[in-house]
Amino acid sequence: MAFILPDLPYAHDALAEFGMSAETLEYHHDLHHNAYVVNGNKLIAGTEWESKSLEDIIIGTYDAKAVAQNGIFNNASQHWNHMQFWEMMGPGKSAMPSELEAALILSLIHI
């Protein structure tokens, strides 16, 4: 399944009051995140991963531990990370979602 760059859920200047300028968001979303999308799509083209979901690509390429697939894993996982990043930040958001907080605490207990 092709990677698709999601629209930001807010305007590029929406985080200026928190110190993230419109220019920073434009660069980070429109160029940096988009590079993971473009490169990921190039890497999965014509492979077994082309028809898989993003989550299946991440899990499958991580589990495979294949050197040739490291680029696929990196681009897929960074695309996923950035999608979460955009959703978790935004005007009016200040607290960590309770599900994420619980998962983080649980994961730290097992370290």
What are these regions (language model features)?
Residues 1-12:
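Acidic, low-complexity proline/glycine-rich segments
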Residues 18-32, 54-80:
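Alpha-helical scaffold segments that form or flank carboxylate-/histidine-based iron centers
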Residues 47-55:
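Surface-exposed patches in mature extracellular/periplasmic domains of secreted proteins
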Residues 72, 97-100:
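Extracellular zinc-dependent metalloprotease catalytic-domain scaffold
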Residues 109-111:
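Conserved small/polar residues in nucleotide/adenosyl-binding loops
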